[in-house]
């Protein structure tokens, strides 16, 4: 904690106005500058593993990397990893789901209009392969299908709500799945980016459900990088940011190659 406090003397800068889709060539922050061009496997992104229906080991490895990067808000590199998973196993429905997932909005940036068509296409490919997926994967696919329209809408709010509702159904069906809890939590965060608490410290209407999902995920897997990441964000402006401190203390060591995750504990430490 001391290192972070010494390095951080001001609030983090406001997030950028837009994020480019996963197909753009800008180097992601979590990838070292000397990394070779093109897709590359990294061994410093942590040990988070989600078994998928594919029997192809390369598809599994790329899927895990994509999920780790998505939880670390490296959406471009996550998209590249999910694309490699699809190359390894074109019939992997949940790999197509991953490609669709990371093209959507997040708490820092809205979905860019150019991402609408590729996100829709990837979601529809996942849907076409749905019968090859496990029951929990099928619910994740159904949720991501609900998240997108074929063309960018004037107002994304109904789609974001439909996605959150579908993820709530997934949590109710699979409450012991930490990833599903974390994804549901993120879907709620996307309904109210950076507005989880009012100026006088009152929780926003969706915040109790958000906290419950993340705290459940942390009980299921205390080292879940996505759960810790989002819990820091969900509590940093709360009346009690200290509740995230034990989790923040572990995060950087869990994924030392994920630049965004390495800096995240400072969001909590600055509030103590």
Residue ranges, per PLM feature:
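Sec-dependent signal peptide recognition
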Residues: 1-2
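Short coil/linker segments at helix-helix boundaries
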Residues: 28-176, 183-223, 228-251, 255-258, ...
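Bacterial signal peptide processing site
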Residues: 9-11
């Amino acid at each position: 904690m001391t290192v972070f406090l010494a390095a951080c003397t001001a609030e983090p800068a406001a997030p950028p106005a837009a994020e480019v889709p996963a197909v753009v060539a800008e180097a992601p922050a979590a990838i070292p500058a000397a990394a070779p061009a093109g897709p590359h496997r990294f061994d410093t992104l942590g040990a988070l593993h989600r078994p998928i229906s594919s029997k192809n080991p390369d598809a599994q490895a790329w899927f895990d990397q994509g999920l780790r990067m998505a939880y670390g808000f490296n959406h471009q590199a996550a998209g590249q990893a999910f694309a490699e998973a699809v190359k390894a196993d074109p019939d992997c429905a949940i790999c197509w789901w991953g490609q669709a997932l990371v093209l959507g909005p997040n708490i820092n940036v809205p979905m860019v209009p150019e991402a609408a068509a590729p996100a829709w296409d990837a979601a529809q490919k996942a849907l076409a392969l749905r019968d090859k997926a496990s029951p929990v994967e099928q619910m994740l696919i159904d949720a991501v299908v609900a998240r997108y329209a074929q063309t960018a809408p004037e107002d994304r709010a109904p789609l974001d709500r439909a996605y959150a509702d579908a993820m709530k159904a997934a949590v109710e069906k699979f409450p012991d799945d930490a990833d599903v809890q974390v994804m549901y939590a993120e879907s709620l965060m996307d309904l109210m980016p950076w507005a989880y608490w009012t100026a006088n410290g009152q929780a926003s209407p969706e915040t109790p459900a958000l906290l419950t999902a993340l705290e459940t995920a942390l009980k299921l897997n205390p080292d879940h990088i996505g759960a810790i990441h989002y819990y820091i964000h969900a509590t940093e402006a709360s009346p009690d940011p200290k509740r995230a401190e034990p989790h923040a203390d572990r995060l950087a060591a869990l994924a030392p190659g994920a630049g965004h995750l390495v800096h995240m504990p400072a969001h909590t430490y600055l509030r103590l």
